[in-house]
A protein has these predicted regions:
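Active-site beta-strand/loop microenvironment that shapes enzyme catalytic pockets
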Residues: 246-280
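N-terminal, motif-rich segments that launch catalysis or mediate targeting to/interaction with membranes
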Residues: 17-245, 275-407
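Sec-dependent signal peptide recognition
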Residues: 1-9
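N-terminal signal peptide c-region/cleavage motif recognized by signal peptidases
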Residues: 11-16
């Protein structure tokens, strides 16, 4: 069916598999006034290996319970190959065994760092470069993160750990996990071929773990079954379970860090372009677009593809640039207040394993048409992003401290 080609192109031309350009900034703003975080004691930094060593039997049991549940509960879930199970006796490479049991990219750095809010950096502290924190495929000219090194046994604020960790899954967790991706693990993990994403860009291999099209019609799924092969809700389930275990067993640093990883996937599905392939276009219009293309009039189809790709990219660029600049001025702003607004929180149901599918993505889909229209109206009058010169080269950003500008 030709509708398949249109939907495949829409997913392939998504400009990025990131839901938001920097999850840390929004997480700070949304969570900083919550008493459970604001009043929580500082936590001690510890390497992953310490948590795994001290809690190995519990981690092994949890991962087996999660695998059994996933096979029964998550649609289109590809079972984990049995040889990836954590060994009964810990090996000499705990980290590798743990990451492969989770079916995460084993090449991620898991650097012990925190991100500060823009304008609140600590220039006297040691910083890491982006390529020391993020795998190569996720590096981008748009990377603006500042990474402050934290040492083992150092005490840090829970909010800093949680907000910083909320950005981490974009540092390579889900890169090259499919059988047709470069590298070795794709042939081992059992996910099969990459269902959607643009193969020209290696970072797009993370898309099926960061996007979820859960509310399409039966006609769309019949024409494009690949849309059902995405697992952001499963990833969040894994990480939330690990967070509960870490908190319960006296490892709050990893509790907050795993919690941030899970929060990342929830935030991804608040992005309408991650929950709806073509916002604002109903099924009849979608079929009309494809019918006209079949008849030789493909201009409207191509325009729709370019429109959604442009709006997706521009809203993420704007969100990142705007937040960075507003925070560096230190001035109040209604949009900043909106991040911390909890007035509607009690109207939402309790969190559950299906929350991403039934609540988060459903709300994003319901709002997607109006959101897309608003972005379109803004782009009609918006100036070219000042992050770019007329030669389409990213301009250097100066930070508040000379020491940072030398990095």
């Amino acid at each position: 069916m030709k509708l398949t080609s249109l939907l495949l192109l829409l997913c392939a031309t998504a400009p990025s598999a990131w839901g938001w350009s920097n999850h840390t900034v929004g997480s700070y703003l949304a969570l900083q006034d919550l008493p459970a975080l604001r009043d929580a004691p500082q936590v001690e930094v510890e390497p992953l290996e310490r948590f795994l060593t001290e809690q190995y039997p519990a981690v092994l049991a949890l991962l087996e319970q999660q695998e059994s549940f996933a096979r029964e509960h998550f649609a289109q879930y590809p079972p984990r190959p049995d040889n990836l199970k954590l060994p009964a006796v810990p090996s000499d490479n705990l980290r590798h065994d743990f990451l492969t049991a989770l079916r995460i990219n084993p090449e991620i750095y898991l650097a012990m760092v925190i991100q500060p809010l823009p304008g609140k950096d600590l220039p006297e502290r040691e910083h890491l470069q982006a390529n020391q924190v993020m795998v190569e495929q996720t590096l981008s000219p748009w990377n603006r993160q500042r990474f402050i090194v934290v040492a083992e046994h150092e005490k840090v604020a829970p909010l800093a750990v949680l907000a910083s960790a909320a950005d981490e899954p974009d540092y390579g967790h889900d890169i090259n996990l499919f059988s047709d991706n470069p590298g070795e693990v794709g042939a081992l993990y059992g996910f099969g071929p990459q269902p959607f994403g643009d193969a020209r860009f290696q970072y797009s291999s993370q898309a099926p773990f960061h996007m979820g099209f859960f509310h399409e019609s039966a006609v769309v799924y019949a024409a494009a079954g690949f849309l059902e092969r995405s697992w952001p809700d499963w990833r969040a389930y894994q990480y939330m379970g690990l967070a509960r275990l870490a908190f319960a067993s006296g490892h709050p640093y990893w509790g907050y860090r795993f919690l941030g990883w899970g929060l990342h996937h929830i935030q991804d599905l608040t992005q309408p372009y991650h929950a709806k392939p073509l916002p604002g276009v109903d099924l009849a219009s979608l079929l009309l677009l494809e019918g006209k293309a079949i008849a030789g009039f493909a201009e409207d189809k191509q325009a729709s593809i370019e429109r959604v790709a442009t709006r997706h990219m521009e809203v993420e660029k704007y969100q990142s640039t705007w937040l960075r600049r507003v925070l560096r001025t230190g001035q109040p702003h209604p949009m900043l207040d909106a991040y911390a607004d909890v007035a509607q929180d009690k109207s939402y149901p309790p969190y559950s394993v299906d929350y991403l599918r039934e609540v988060v993505s459903a709300e994003a889909v319901n709002d997607s048409a109006a959101f897309d229209e608003a972005i379109g109206q803004w782009l009609e009058t918006a100036p070219v992003s000042s992050d770019f010169s007329s030669g389409n080269q990213l301009q250097r950003e100066d930070f508040d401290h000379p020491a940072l500008n030398q990095q």
